Design a protein with these regions (language model features):
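Short regulatory alpha-helical coupling segments
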Residues: 8-9, 22-42, 73-81, 99
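Short beta-strand->loop micro-motif that forms the acidic, two-metal-ion catalytic signature
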Residues: 54, 69, 76, 87, ...
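Active-site-proximal alpha-helical element of nucleotidyl cyclase-like catalytic domains
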Residues: 64-85, 93, 112, 117
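Short helix/loop segment flanking the catalytic signature motif in cyclic-nucleotide metabolism enzymes
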Residues: 68, 95-115, 142, 148-149
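A short pre-motif secondary-structure segment
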Residues: 85-88, 129
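Catalytic core regions of nucleotide second-messenger enzymes
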Residues: 117-133
Length: 172
């Protein structure tokens, strides 16, 4: 039984970044939407995307790209609160659930994540390389479904990219 629990837990973790994966996100977001309808505790969804990651990977290789993914995941995990969760959604995209936050606090945390990632650098030979992220966020509303909440945050993330990257846009 213990081995089964272990393998079930491993099935919810991204092996490269060691953060929760998309399957874990799908389980968690459904539960949180249900709880919101019952208890009315606000929470936020952030969608984070590493800016120009494909170009970075093409130029510096997948090994360094993997280091970047691990580092960004770790930075996000270290920046958010213990009650929050980070998930690798796929590729260079991460999703963060911020529990018990309003729009203002969610925005502050998102900006803090953005700035922390911006401070990190990666050594490749004699070069110090940096990456940035764009973040879109949304606060849960009464009418939200799993897809509507994600779509709002994802759209906001693309607005952040289109506005010049390395920034946060919160959906209203």
């Amino acid at each position: 039984a213990e081995k089964l629990e272990q393998s079930q837990a491993q099935a919810l973790v991204d092996p490269l970044t060691n953060v929760l994966n998309r399957a874990a996100y799908n389980l968690k977001v459904g539960q949180l939407i249900h709880e919101f309808k019952r208890y009315k505790e606000e929470w936020a969804l952030l969608v984070l995307d590493i800016d120009k990651f494909k170009d970075f990977n093409d130029k510096y290789g997948h090994q360094l790209g993997d280091r970047v993914l691990k580092s960004v995941a770790g930075t996000v995990r270290d920046t958010i609160r213990v009650s929050d969760q980070v998930f690798r959604f796929g590729g260079e995209e991460f999703v963060v659930i911020l529990n018990r936050v309003d729009q203002s606090f969610a925005t502050q945390l998102a900006v803090k994540i953005c700035r922390q990632v911006e401070k990190d650098y990666f050594v490749d030979g004699d070069k110090k390389l940096k990456v940035t992220i764009s973040i879109g966020g949304s606060i849960i509303t009464e009418d939200d479904t799993e897809s509507s909440l994600f779509e709002r945050a994802d759209k906001a993330m693309y607005q952040a990219k289109n506005a010049g990257r390395n920034q946060v846009v919160m959906a209203i």
